[in-house]
């Protein structure tokens, strides 16, 4: 994993610089994310790793999977990655691109894990409170984990705020056992 991120970094940096020069980081973000999702698809991933599938076939596969959602510049990027046998790095490239984009915008990703599904209005109400706690602008990524029993757990970078019932029970168990 660490090696693939190291190899993916120059591609992601070049892609980010190009997107920044075009002045449309958000549009490129959507397209790069789509490419990463396509590459992470198990069928596509196995095709990428199959030595019997030629580079032009892989490029055609990506172009047909993405359709018109990917513009000509990113289509050329797919061609470049294919020629260098790097299509399998697209999920890492997409992740690094998002990291660079957030750094440019001064935001961080808040991974919000809830015991129960929460709607967009609840997330919108929660974000300003979390921004005050973490002292940074946040973008939310929400997931559900019923094992939390109740409450939420928020992870921003290397910081975690655990306001879940499971977290409280674990803390009590630790206190009682020590």
Curated annotation (Swiss-Prot):
It is found in: Cell inner membrane. Keywords: ATP synthesis, Cell inner membrane, Cell membrane, CF(1), Hydrogen ion transport, Ion transport, Membrane, Transport. Its main location: membrane. InterPro entries: ATP_synth_OSCP/delta_N_sf, ATPase_OSCP/dsu. GO terms for cellular component: plasma membrane; proton-transporting ATP synthase complex. GO terms for molecular function: proton-transporting ATP synthase activity, rotational mechanism. It holds the Pfam family OSCP. It is a peripheral membrane protein. NCBIfam families: ATP_synt_delta, PRK05758.2-2. F(1)F(0) ATP synthase produces ATP from ADP in the presence of a proton or sodium gradient. F-type ATPases consist of two structural domains, F(1) containing the extramembraneous catalytic core and F(0) containing the membrane proton channel, linked together by a central stalk and a peripheral stalk. During catalysis, ATP synthesis in the catalytic domain of F(1) is coupled via a rotary mechanism of the central stalk subunits to proton translocation. Belongs to the ATPase delta chain family. F-type ATPases have 2 components, F(1) - the catalytic core - and F(0) - the membrane proton channel. F(1) has five subunits: alpha(3), beta(3), gamma(1), delta(1), epsilon(1). F(0) has three main subunits: a(1), b(2) and c(10-14). The alpha and beta chains form an alternating ring which encloses part of the gamma chain. F(1) is attached to F(0) by a central stalk formed by the gamma and epsilon chains, while a peripheral stalk is formed by the delta and b chains. This is ATP synthase subunit delta. The lineage of its organism: Bacteria, Pseudomonadati, Pseudomonadota, Betaproteobacteria, Rhodocyclales. The gene is atpH.
């Amino acid at each position: 994993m660490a090696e693939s991120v190291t190899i993916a970094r120059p591609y992601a940096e070049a892609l980010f610089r190009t997107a920044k020069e075009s002045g449309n980081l958000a549009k490129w973000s959507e397209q790069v994310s789509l490419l990463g999702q396509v590459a992470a698809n198990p069928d596509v991933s196995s095709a990428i790793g199959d030595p019997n599938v030629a580079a032009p076939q892989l490029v055609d596969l990506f172009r047909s999977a993405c359709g018109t959602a990917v513009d000509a510049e990113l289509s050329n990027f797919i061609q470049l990655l294919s020629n260098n046998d790097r299509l399998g790095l697209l999920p890492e490239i997409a992740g690094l691109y998002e990291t660079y984009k957030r750094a440019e915008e001064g935001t961080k990703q808040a991974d919000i894990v809830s015991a129960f599904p929460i709607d967009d209005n609840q997330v919108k109400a929660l974000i300003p409170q979390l921004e005050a706690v973490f002292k940074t602008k946040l973008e939310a990524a929400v997931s559900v984990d019923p094992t939390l029993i109740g409450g939420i757990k928020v992870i921003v970078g290397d910081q975690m705020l655990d306001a879940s019932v499971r977290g409280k029970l674990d803390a009590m168990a630790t206190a009682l056992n020590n």
